Each structure stands twice: as structure tokens, then as C-alpha cells.
Amino acid sequence: MLAGIREILIIAAIDETPKCERLLGDGSQFGLKLSYAVQPKPEGLAQAFIIGEDFIGDDSVAMVLGDNLFYGNGLGHLLREAAKQQNRATIFGYYVENPQSFGVVEFDDDGVPVSIVEKPKHPKSNYAVTGLYFYDNRVVEYAKSLKPSKRGELEITDINKIYLENGDLDIRLMGRGFAWLDTGTVDALLDAANFIKTVERLQGIKISAPEEIAYNMRWISKRALLESAEKYGKSSYGQHLLSVAEGRILYTSNDISGIGERPRWGIESEQEKH
């Protein structure tokens, strides 16, 4: 949403897709248009572009993994810059202590990326590729051209390699102040929950609220925001939406993008959370 994207295809396993649809509906409450598709078998991240070919059409596309959490002041600006790129791909690197568990970017002495290796035994850097990707329309044909890896999957790393070899890959590093949490394990999910709890307790506001982002992007009206607040009642989430609607939350102007943020007391901005 912070990238300015309003049409979203949610791809999930056959038993999970109906649950997602019941939870999120058509997305109109967020000013979005949501569609749904099934991945019959877990045959790799790159398969998403084949499944979503009709949805993508002639457009460029972004993909984010559903079990990844990103947080940081300036995130929206980073995403919008990536979305503006034409005839290129953008991925994001993040410093980790266990690069063996991720796709890893190798850099030359000048900091230029020279290779990407999936879960290397002997990683040449500590920068992992996060679960957030922006591609031009060529990604669909690139995905179709892939052959399954040894583990029987169409690897997203192989798509990134194609863009890298063609000189069409940008790698943006998420530095200090950004948090990336991959919640693919029980322990990691607990870490993410505790992180969110801590940040929300310290700040006194929600780490992310789709209705809030939609309102600041001018995708939904104040009346729609108040209706959502009423839906959640006296819960902390409902009260947060009410505070947004009543203008009680100030926003910093660190990452102004000029794509429709509502001014608050002469300060233009948005909530830099995804």
C-alpha cells in the first residue's frame, strides 16, 4: 500500500485461500481491489508470476511474502522509489547473522552486486535478500523459462540472477533503523509478536493499520475510517483508528512522496509502516 499499489493478488494454498478471502473480502474497506488465486503445490516463489499472469497483464509487479514483516521510518519512500523504476528489477538486502538460511548477495570491492546464491554453505557476505521484490513485466516470461531446482521448485533467486546478468537489477540495502522479520518458524513468529508489542507499547500507536494508510493516501473517506473504527469498538485497534480520524496523531515529514497524503496541522506525511 505504501508503494501506491491498490490492486493485489493474494496467492495461497487451496485450504488457506478461502480463509484469506473471508478475512479481507474484496479489499474495498482499505481502498483496494483484492483478488485471490490458489497455488496447488508449493513449487517455488517464482511460480507466483505464472499463476498471476492474467492478473499482471502488461503491468510491472511487486511481490511480498506473506510471512515477512518490514518496519522502519522511510520504508514508504523506499518502496515508492522501487515502484517507479522501469525496465528493471529491485530487491532489498538486509544484514543477517545466519546468511546460510537465505539467498545471499555477493558484492565486489566497490559495493556492486556480482552474484546471488541461494542458501550457500559458505556465504560471501552477510546480506540476505528479503521477501520483497519489484519487477518489470519481463518477469512473467522469465518465470516460464525456469527449470525446477534440485528441491523441485522454481526459485526466485534464479529470476534475480537473470536480471543481474542482464545488468537490470538494483539492490537497495535496508540499513540501521529497519527491521525485517521472517516469521516462517514458531520462534520467529514469537519474535515478531514481541517486537510489535514492544514498539506499540513504547510509541502508544499501532505499528500498522491498513485503514490508516488508506485514509492518508486518500483512498477512503473519513466516514469509511470512522465506520472501521466503530466496527472494532473499544479495542486498541478501534481506538487507534478513531484517533486517526479525529486528527490526534501527528505524522513526521521525513518521507513526503506527494501522492495524496493528507496534511495534519501543516505537516504532510504518512505512517511509514507496511
Predicted regions and their residues:
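Short, amphipathic C-terminal "tail helix"
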Residues: W219-I220, L225-W265
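A structural signal for short hydrophobic beta-strand segments in well-ordered beta-sheet cores
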Residues: V105-F107
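Hydrophobic packing residues within well-ordered alpha-helices of enzyme cores
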Residues: C20-L24, A143, A192, L241
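Conserved donor-nucleotide/metal-binding helix-loop-beta segment in metal-dependent transferases, i.e.
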Residues: G72-Q100
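Flexible, glycine-rich loop/tail regions that form catalytic "lids" or insertion modules at the edges
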Residues: M174, E200, P210-E212, R218, ...
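Catalytic-core segments of class I nucleotidyltransferases/pyrophosphorylases
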Residues: A62, A83, V112-E212, R223-A224, ...
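Conserved N-terminal catalytic core of the sugar/cofactor nucleotidyltransferase
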Residues: M1-L65, L69-H77, K84, E227, ...
